[in-house]
């Protein structure tokens, strides 16, 4: 069966979407504002729900984000296929979720393949409105999946919007990355808000090729101030004037006199492990670990048994690693 349209699940328990059918977004039209939940930019949107299972289906040609759960717990996604090519067509965006398992699935997207965020599309998106803290994120497992990331975005991405107190205990294991085509990266943490991101494990990941773009990255872990930050400029004309692309897209500078204000809204990244990572083919892209300032650092990145073309990475030079405001990096 082919469903042309979209699925919405709200304030529900014990919901299953099963079978071998297709949810097709080809005919979905947008009025241009993807921030609203009921826009057809999302093929499956869930919120404030529990015990949800999605299994066996194919999701095709999403306008933007494909599967987007917000504040969902006990979510299982197994043996699904996502095939997109439009810009911004993220695969699975886990927003403020807990106790999630994603397994045995294939994702081909033209933006982030799988993303962990803390963001609600009900909240006011900028200052001076009161900060809205989303539920914490914990216990996410992604295993046995295959990814193909096209020109935009990243393969595994935590961020940019991380508006909660803590994101912890995330595991990505036994996955294959067929290709990373654009200027993004394979392993990514972009903390653009105030959260503490800790205890993240990438294990037994095979990357066939990660260097098709000249400025692509393998590992990108950073604490940033960007157009996605909650404390960004309120005036959109200022954002357009100042934003720039460097190693990351859509950065904005900290203006003179605003250093303490923006520093107070940055978070932390600590205890991140990459174990048994294989880059099988192509040249090795560079990697970057970048804190925000001396009080908001990247702390404790552990790389254990990473190989490129069969050769083991033994030090920062082998990894082509650049660091700033970063401490306690181990490579063995």
Where are these regions (language model features)?
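Extracellular/periplasmic carbohydrate-active domains that bind, remodel
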Residues: 1-332
